[in-house]
Curated annotation (Swiss-Prot):
Reactions accelerated catalytically: (2R)-2-phosphoglycerate = (2R)-3-phosphoglycerate
Sequence positions that bind substrate: H128, R158, D159, R190, R196, R267, P268, D269, R270, K340
Recorded name of the encoding gene: gpmI1
UniProt lineage: Archaea, Methanobacteriati, Methanobacteriota, Stenosarchaea group, Methanomicrobia
Active-site residue numbers: S67
Keyword Ligase part of the UniProt annotation: no
SUPFAM superfamilies per the UniProt record, alphabetical: 2,3-Bisphosphoglycerate-independent phosphoglycerate mutase, substrate-binding domain (SSF64158), Alkaline phosphatase-like (SSF53649)
Stated name of the protein: 2,3-bisphosphoglycerate-independent phosphoglycerate mutase 1
Cofactor note: Binds 2 manganese ions per subunit.
Homology family: Belongs to the BPG-independent phosphoglycerate mutase family.
Any one of the GO CC terms: cytoplasm
Length: 517
């Protein structure tokens, strides 16, 4: 006799990256877009607001949320105190200045009479790095008597306004002059130095500037480098690598054998490629004309496979959502396009690379284009087609999906493109909801942080390319088992999903279910 396996009715967590809530209509791509599907879901089903920024997600008060932080909190089911908060606290306590990873880099530079290079995103954004950390490193180098200290400044323009760098670089230059002898040696937009999508031609441009002093442009000082980039029509993110020269027209500094590097970005995803280029012996992604042997320190753990000193190693999170589902023997799927794949896997699993038993992963490639305003739908339709097939397969108990569009297109600052991105996601959510209803599944639809709801700076009327600190909506879609949801935080999502699955939440999860009893 043939026994048929009963098809599962999946519980979905659909994360609409960058889908924030803001009442004002000006510069609000979410309100400007036609969103019949999301509008219908909000009218017909229970929903609430979730805090997705500041202390609610383990960041300093008022600090905007981001995708890494959002997914960590969602998966952990508790407030996860972020690296930004941990590092700020260590500076206040004084532990920062005794950190063995930093002191190792400094000892190496002093022992070899070599240079200490401080490399990373010069920004107040607080997403990848923070200006106070750079200041603390400069003070530490001065305190320890390092003679040759050079800064390789990557410019932001995404998590802060597109032309914030000139003021920030002027301020950093002044700080260097007042606190020792550090000098800015190179400038590069994050588009080049911090690529994460294996566009190695971009990484190579930054690497060559750092190791050979070879770059598209050279200027006598950092402020001129930024000013001239603005004249060329480049905003901070896209400033081409520029080498700062000394009085003889030679590069102020290049990274050489026996030098020390401290990469002060604390977020891993955009620090990996450049790190690999420096430290991987078998690196084949582009030819390295110079490969200096350096003492390399990472601010946080960029890659589990690299044996490098880490200033702030990860704190282990136990009993995160994926682990709890796995222990219950449930089949789970994580699906996203390239831009957010790490978020639904690595970050949702508490910052761990490992895949849990019963966890499948599906990566849909993001389109290979210069900027996503050129294709606001990105790969959302392909993600949708794939996930619909997976829903109909009846294989999965839980599916976690991320749509990247509202965030990635929001970062371009181009309003019309962001509107199209919102509409593409709305269309995809509608298709998924239809299929879920057919198979008897349910969904929680929410976001990890805001972005597309504010595409314009209301004061300056310039494009707003950063995340926001606005709340996000959370919708329950499915049967009438849930009568209402109460307002909460991102860390309340995992306990809510576990309640829907009738699984007791582990004691490590301090978040509360959003379901109104």
């Amino acid at each position: 006799m043939l026994h048929m396996t009963q098809a599962k009715k999946p519980l979905m967590l659909i994360i609409l990256d960058g889908w924030g809530y803001r009442e004002a209509r000006e510069g609000n791509a979410i309100l400007a877009a036609r969103t019949p599907n999301l509008d219908h879901l909000i009218e017909e089903y229970p929903w609430c607001f979730l805090e997705a920024s500041g202390e609610a997600v383990g960041l300093p008060e008022g600090q905007m949320g981001n995708s890494e932080v959002g997914h960590l909190n969602i998966g952990a089911g508790r407030i996860v105190y972020q690296d930004l908060t941990r590092i700020n606290f260590s500076i206040r306590k004084g532990d920062f200045f005794k950190n063995p990873a930093f002191l190792g880099a400094i000892s190496n530079a002093k022992a070899n009479d070599s240079s200490l290079h401080l490399m990373g995103l010069v920004s107040y954004g607080g997403v990848h790095s923070y200006m106070a950390h750079i200041h603390a490193l400069i003070k530490l180098a001065q305190q320890e008597g390092v003679k040759k200290v050079y800064i390789h400044a990557f410019l932001d323009g995404r998590d802060v306004p597109p032309k914030a760098a000139l003021k920030d670089i002027e301020e950093l230059d002044a700080f260097c002059k007042e606190n020792g002898n550090a000098k800015i040696a190179t400038i590069s937009g994050r588009y080049y130095a911090m690529d994460r999508d294996k566009r190695w031609d971009r990484t190579k441009l930054a690497y060559d500037a750092l190791t050979m002093g070879v770059a598209p442009y050279k200027t006598p000082d950092a402020e001129t480098a930024v000013s001239e980039a603005y004249k060329r029509g480049e905003t901070d993110e896209f400033v081409k690598p520029t080498v700062i020269t000394d009085s003889e027209g030679k590069p102020e500094a290049v990274i050489k054998d026996n030098d020390s590097i401290i990469f002060f970005n604390f977020r891993p995803d955009r620090a990996r490629q450049l790190t690999w280029a420096f430290v991987n012996k078998d690196f084949e992604n582009f030819p390295r004309e110079k490969h200096p042997k350096v003492y390399y320190v990472c601010m946080a753990q960029y890659d589990e496979t690299l044996d490098l000193p880490i200033a702030f190693p990860p704190e282990e999170l136990e009993n995160v959502l994926g682990e709890v589902l796995s222990k219950q023997g449930l089949a789970q799927l994580r699906i996203a396009e390239t831009e957010k794949y790490a978020h639904v896997t690595f970050f949702l699993n508490g910052g761990q690379e490992k895949c849990y038993e019963g966890e499948d992963r599906c990566l849909i490639p993001s389109p290979k284009i210069a900027t996503y305003d050129l294709k606001p739908e990105m790969s959302a339709y392909e993600v949708t087609e794939e996930v619909i097939g997976r829903i109909r397969s009846g294989k999965y108990d839980v599916i976690v999906l991320n749509f990247a569009n509202m965030d990635m297109v929001g970062h371009t600052g181009i309003f019309e493109a962001a509107v199209k991105a919102v509409e593409a996601v709305d269309s995809c959510v509608g298709k998924i909801a239809t299929v879920l209803k057919e198979v008897g599944g349910v969904a929680i639809i929410t976001a990890d942080h805001g972005n597309a709801e504010q595409m314009e700076n209301p004061t300056t009327e310039e494009p707003h390319t950063a995340h926001t600190s606005n709340p996000v909506k959370c919708i329950y879609f499915g049967n009438d088992e849930v009568k209402g949801l109460k307002n909460g935080k991102l860390c309340d999502l995992a306990p809510t999903l576990l309640e829907l699955l009738k699984i007791r939440k582990p004691e490590e999860m301090t978040g509360e279910s959003l379901i109104i009893k």
